[in-house]
């Protein structure tokens, strides 16, 4: 029986596929041909293949060596690995290009928007124009079948409508702030968004922030306060408008979790943003007409003595950049984690502040710069600490 078992094992081992490896093994046999207790049949794996020992026989201790030259991976496996590596590099390069474009569009939006708002301080009209431009691009995208148009129910529209109202009003108050104070100061105030996120998440979603997250809000609030006290262009309307923008934008984000729940899965990120933009435009029209009337008529613009063609070109470019950077923000968020997106958004705010200071030659004191830096540092810390924040929603 022992000889039969040994012969059976040897036959099975000899039929195994030979791979590219070197295997050294020893097996001791007893005088009767049985395997001595404790002796092992070694097996190595190299290059993804099994390598077995040749048949051992003779009724005595045998030492076998099998030598084989190292062989490369099969051609199909090597090509697949190379393809995956090229694909990963291409995805990384594409993501990097999207982030750079996101930053550039944000910079140019703030520059063109400020250039339009300085001679025409009509935030409701400018907001309606920007949302109208975005809606036109969206319908063009659907008409050309660049992206499939969504199928949306009345119940979904009813749930998205409050979010659209928050989105529209947040944009109105941002434009109102930009028309009153420097671009750099508006974005310094808007760095306090995490404070409103924590407050609204606790109130509406029942999320309890950790002590570390609460601690990260201290430099944010302190930095914004320090920058506000030393801001040369300080204006109360500009300050409270930026604060109201923070409250409305973060209310939109928090309520989207509460109102939409799992139903947003029926809409992809692009179509959800598209519906949000179109509804925001429709809601902005009556507000614009009631608050400011029709300010973009050719007769009114000529009466101001402004260069009509130049003003319209800048307004159109601001609308294009506004829609472009917001859509890119959604697309980037779909590719990375929320924490990574928050950090990238923090860096984006730094880039916008620096670019606006350089372009508009905004005077800034050392204490003001310190306050801005402390606030942005707090935002970065908050973004990193969100990684450890428990998910209660």
Curated annotation (Swiss-Prot):
Ranges for domain EamA: 123-228
Entry's Gene Ontology molecular function annotations: phosphoenolpyruvate:phosphate antiporter activity; triose-phosphate transmembrane transporter activity; triose-phosphate:phosphate antiporter activity
Domain of life, per lineage: Eukaryota
Keywords: Chloroplast, Membrane, Plastid, Pyruvate, Sugar transport, Transit peptide, Transmembrane, Transmembrane helix, Transport
Membrane topology qualifier: Multi-pass membrane protein
The UniProt record lists the keyword Plastid: yes
GO biological process: phosphoenolpyruvate transport; triose phosphate transmembrane transport
Localization in the cell: Plastid, Chloroplast membrane
Transit peptide (first-last residue): 1-65
Signal sequence interval, chain numbering: none
One cellular component (GO) term of this entry: Golgi apparatus
Family: Belongs to the TPT transporter family. PPT (TC 2.A.7.9) subfamily.
Role according to the record: Phosphoenolpyruvate/phosphate translocator that transports phosphoenolpyruvate (PEP) and dihydroxyacetone phosphate.
Protein name: Phosphoenolpyruvate/phosphate translocator 3, chloroplastic
Lineage: Eukaryota, Viridiplantae, Streptophyta, Embryophyta, Tracheophyta
């Amino acid at each position: 029986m022992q000889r039969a078992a040994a012969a059976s094992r040897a036959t099975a081992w000899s039929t195994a596929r030979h791979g590219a490896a070197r295997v050294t093994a020893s097996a001791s046999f007893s005088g009767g041909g049985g395997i001595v207790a404790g002796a092992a049949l070694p097996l190595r794996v190299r290059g993804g293949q099994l390598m077995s020992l040749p048949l051992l026989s003779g009724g005595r201790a045998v030492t076998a060596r099998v030598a084989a030259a190292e062989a490369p991976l099969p051609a199909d496996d090597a090509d697949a690995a190379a393809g995956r590596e090229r694909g990963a590099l291409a995805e990384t390069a594409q993501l990097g290009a999207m982030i750079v474009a996101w930053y550039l569009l944000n910079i140019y939006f703030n520059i063109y928007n400020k250039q339009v708002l300085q001679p025409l301080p009509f935030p409701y009209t400018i907001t309606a124009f920007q949302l109208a431009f975005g809606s036109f691009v969206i319908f063009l995208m659907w008409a050309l079948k660049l992206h499939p148009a969504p199928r949306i129910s009345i119940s979904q529209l009813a749930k998205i409508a409050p979010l659209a109202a928050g989105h529209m009003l947040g944009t109105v108050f941002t434009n109102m702030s930009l028309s009153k104070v420097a671009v750099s100061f508006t974005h310094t105030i808007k760095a306090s968004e995490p404070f409103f996120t924590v407050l609204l998440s606790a109130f509406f979603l029942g999320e309890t922030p950790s002590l570390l997250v609460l601690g990260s809000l201290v430099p944010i609030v302190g930095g914004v306060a320090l920058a506000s006290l030393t801001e040369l262009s300080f204006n109360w309307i500009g300050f409270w408008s930026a604060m109201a923008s923070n409250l409305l934008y973060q209310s939109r984000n928090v309520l989207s979790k509460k109102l939409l729940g799992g139903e947003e899965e029926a809409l992809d990120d692009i179509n959800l943003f598209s519906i949000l933009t179109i509804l925001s435009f429709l809601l902005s029209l009556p507000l614009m007409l009631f608050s400011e009337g029709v300010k973009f008529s050719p007769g009114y613009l000529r009466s101001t003595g402004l260069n009509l063609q130049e003003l319209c070109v800048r307004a159109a470019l601001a609308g294009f950049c506004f829609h472009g950077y917001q859509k890119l923000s959604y697309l980037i968020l779909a590719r990375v984690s929320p924490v990574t997106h928050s950090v990238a958004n923090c860096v984006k705010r730094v880039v916008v502040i620096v670019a606006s200071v350089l372009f508009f030659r905004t005077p800034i004191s050392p204490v003001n710069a310190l306050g801005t830096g402390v606030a942005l540092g707090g935002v970065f810390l908050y973004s990193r600490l969100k990684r450890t924040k428990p998910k209660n929603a």
